[in-house]
Amino acid sequence: MQSSRSVSTEAFVRLVVDIGNTTTTLAVFTGETEPSVESVQSTLFGEPKAVAELFLSLAHRHGTPQAVAVCSVVPAAAASCSAQLESLFSVPVVTIAASLRLPFQLDYATPHTFGADRIALCAWSRHLFGDCPVIAVDIGTAITFDVLDAEGNYRGGLIMPGIDMMAGALNSRTAQLPLVDIDKPESLLGRSTIECIRNGIFWGAVRQIAGLIDAIGAELPGESKAAPAEVLVTGGNSRIIAPEIASITHLDELAVLRGIDLLLRLNS
């Protein structure tokens, strides 16, 4: 459901929780200031006592949250997290989903399967760039592309393995290839097996992402050489990948969190 409703900017404490496959990020927003952010391993949500202590510690340091939102790609963790937050702070929890009031028009064959993190990123992209076409890329456990046209209509997306998933697959599905941490190589070609894996995954991801951005832009309605699409990139591995791609116009590692907060304010 697309909305033109204005967003409240009152200076109340808002807690947003982004539960990912690997890492969970928590952010406390107050007014329009930059959020206070911290991250924990998502496995923590299997320990209710530890989760309660984490939330109470945040409240002690930043004030009791008056509005809360949970965005999760792990359904079981989302349910337990929301229940704990409601119990601890006696506030309703907004769960990010396609059924919320959205600042863009989501045309998707299976909206119930559209990732909550992708919804938040699209929402922030539309809010940030207004009437410009946007290509939003999240370089995390998976690499996702989501595309909005100049009218705020969702045009489609892409999902591919993230760089750590690629490294894990090479290790787990072969007999001799080691598990390699991926960072920026010093050269294109590797001169050891570890270097070859690292270089292949890193530069392969760079070329894939750059090529797909160009291909999407070429067929995106409303884009021209005079007014190209904005390209917003976020995600845990965005900082090492983004500098290698000239077509990326904006890098914001907090973009999903900002989108969750935006949706919280739109739906509170």
Curated annotation (Swiss-Prot):
Keywords: ATP-binding, Coenzyme A biosynthesis, Cytoplasm, Kinase, Metal-binding, Nucleotide-binding, Potassium, Transferase. ATP binds at residues 18-25, 141. It comes from the Bacteria. Its EC number is 2.7.1.33. Its main location: cytoplasm. SUPFAM superfamilies: Actin-like ATPase domain. The active site is at residue 117. Substrate binds at residues 108, 115-118, 193. InterPro entries: ATPase_NBD, Type_III_PanK. GO terms for cellular component: cytoplasm. Coiled coil: none annotated. Pathway: Cofactor biosynthesis; coenzyme A biosynthesis; CoA from (R)-pantothenate: step 1/5. The keyword Metal-binding applies. A monovalent cation. Ammonium or potassium. Pfam families: Pan_kinase. It is found in: Cytoplasm. GO terms for molecular function: ATP binding; metal ion binding; pantothenate kinase activity. It catalyses: (R)-pantothenate + ATP = (R)-4'-phosphopantothenate + ADP + H(+). Homodimer. Catalyzes the phosphorylation of pantothenate (Pan), the first step in CoA biosynthesis. Belongs to the type III pantothenate kinase family. This is Type III pantothenate kinase. It comes from Chlorobaculum parvum (strain DSM 263 / NCIMB 8327) (Chlorobium vibrioforme subsp. thiosulfatophilum).
